[in-house]
Amino acid sequence: MSTLYHTCDKIEQRIIWIDCEMTGLDVEKQTLCEIALIVTDSELNTIATGPDIVIHQPKEVLDNMEEWPRNTFHENGLMEKIIASKYSMADAENEVIDFLKLHALPGKSPIAGNSIYMDRLFIKKYMPKLDKFAHYRCIDVSTIKGLVQRWYPDYKHPKKQCTHRAFDDIMESIAELKNYRESIFVKSTASSF
């Protein structure tokens, strides 16, 4: 179920925030098990809160999980939800696309998040319709964080909860980018290009 918020914005400037949980990081051996979305305007105001879907995976897939996600998903309760889920990969992708059709234009909105390139690799392989719906560009908050760590080593980064659940991770990514925007980026009214 999605939640809609009203703000003044241009639909072609919207950002699709995505976070995925995977059974590991090797896209050739592992798979998606959770995906959540939020659509914001260009000012990072929430336009709509999308679905947060746990995707069922069979025993043989879960038996092949990498150690870190196996341990983490047992601790945070995601493992039980994966086993109990009735969503197939196709069901999840279709629900995500249906949500995005209401709140973004195909091919216009970039996807955003922390280490979003990794999510994008899995999306490209397992949810190709979603990959095609989003603009080819990505907004990777972890890239900005890496630059801030190097250029402003004394900067106090926002604390994260690290629940390793997709929706929580998106909310933290949006808050993190808002923090960098307010405290690191210089406000300008003129373009230097």
UniProtKB/Swiss-Prot annotation:
Its EC number is 3.1.15.-. It is an enzyme of class 3 (hydrolase). The active site is at Y136. It comes from the Eukaryota. Residues 15-177 form the Exonuclease domain. Keywords: Exonuclease, Hydrolase, Nuclease. Transmembrane segments: none annotated. Pfam families: RNase_T. One of its GO terms (molecular function) is nucleic acid binding. 3'-to-5' exoribonuclease specific for small oligoribonucleotides. Belongs to the oligoribonuclease family. This is Probable oligoribonuclease.
